[in-house]
C-alpha cells in the first residue's frame, strides 16, 4: 500500500503559478538529494519528468517520490510503503516547505497517522502468502524482510524493532548477502540471503545460546 499527498499549485487570474524545477524542489529542504536523473535534467520543470526519488543521505533509510500531476495541477508526494520515523519527519518537513511555497493545502494529511500507516503496511505484506520475503528498496541497497521479521514489527515495540532491523541490514559490507537475525527462546536464527545469477537463495542456521 502507498499513501499519496497532493499539494495544489497556486492559481490566480493570470493562470497557474510557475511549476518548480526538480532542482528547486530539492532546495526546499536542506540536504535533500535525488539521483533519479543527471543534474542537467533537474533544471527542468517537475512536470517534464516522470518523478524524482528523494532522500537525505545520512538520515533517510528509504526514498520518497515527488512528481507533478498535470490533470490535478498539483504536486504529488508518494510515501514508501515502509519507512522510519525519521523518513516521515523528513517528508513532513518537505510537505510543509512546499505548502509554504504554494500557499494552498496538503490534501490527504488530515487524519493521517504515521504509526497506523506503518502497521497497515506490515499487515498488507503479511497478507501476501505467496511471497517468502518482502523486498524494499532502501536509499542505497534493497532490504529483505522475512515473514518472521514482519510479524515482530506488529508487536508493541514493532516500529523500534523495524528501525533497528533496517539499520543493522544497512551496515552489511556487501550487496551480495543480507542476514536476518531472529531471537527466540535462547535460539538465534540467522537467515543469510544472497543473490547469484539473478536468483534468490536462503540458508537458515540455528545458534543455541
Model-predicted regions and their roles:
Residues 66-67, 86-89, 93-96, 192, ...:
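General detector of folded, globular domains
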Residues 19-28, 77-106:
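Ampiphathic alpha-helical segments that act as solvent-exposed interaction surfaces
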Residues 44-47, 109-118:
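Short proline/glycine- and acidic-rich turn/helix-capping motifs at secondary-structure junctions
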Residues 1-2, 49, 99-102:
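A short, compositionally biased
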Residues 24-86:
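Short, intrinsically disordered low-complexity segments
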Residues 13-16, 62-64, 82-90, 200:
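Short, surface-exposed beta-strand/loop "edge" segments at domain boundaries and coil↔beta transitions
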Residues 118-209:
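Aromatic/basic-lined ligand-recognition segments
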Residues 1-46, 135-157, 163:
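Short, extreme N-terminal segment that most often corresponds to the first beta-strand
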Amino acid at each position: 500500500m502507498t499513501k499519496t499527498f497532493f499539494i495544489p499549485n497556486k492559481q490566480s487570474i493570470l493562470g497557474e503559478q510557475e511549476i518548480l524545477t526538480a532542482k528547486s524542489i530539492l532546495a526546499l529542504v536542506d540536504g535533500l538529494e535525488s539521483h533519479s536523473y543527471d543534474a542537467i535534467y533537474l533544471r527542468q520543470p517537475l512536470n517534464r519528468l516522470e518523478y524524482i526519488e528523494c532522500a537525505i543521505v545520512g538520515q533517510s533509510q528509504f526514498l520518497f517520490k515527488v512528481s507533478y500531476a498535470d490533470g490535478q495541477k498539483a504536486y504529488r508526494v508518494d510515501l514508501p510503503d515502509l519507512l522510519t520515523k525519521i523518513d516521515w519527519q523528513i517528508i513532513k518537513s518537505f510537505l510543509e516547505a512546499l505548502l509554504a511555497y504554494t500557499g494552498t493545502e496538503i490534501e490527504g494529511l488530515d487524519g493521517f497517522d504515521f504509526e497506523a500507516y506503518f502497521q497497515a503496511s506490515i499487515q498488507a505484506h503479511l497478507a501476501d502468502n505467496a511471497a517468502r520475503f518482502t523486498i524494499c528498496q532502501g536509499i542505497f541497497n534493497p532490504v529483505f524482510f522475512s515473514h518472521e521479521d514482519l510479524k515482530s514489527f506488529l508487536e508493541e515495540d514493532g516500529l523500534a524493532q523495524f528501525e533497528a532491523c533496517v539499520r543493522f541490514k544497512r551496515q552489511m559490507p556487501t550487496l551480495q548477502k543480507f542476514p536476518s537475525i531472529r531471537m527466540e527462546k535462547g535460539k538465534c536464527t540467522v537467515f543469510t540471503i544472497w543473490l547469484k545469477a539473478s536468483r534468490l537463495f536462503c540458508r537458515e542456521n540455528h545458534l543455541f545460546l
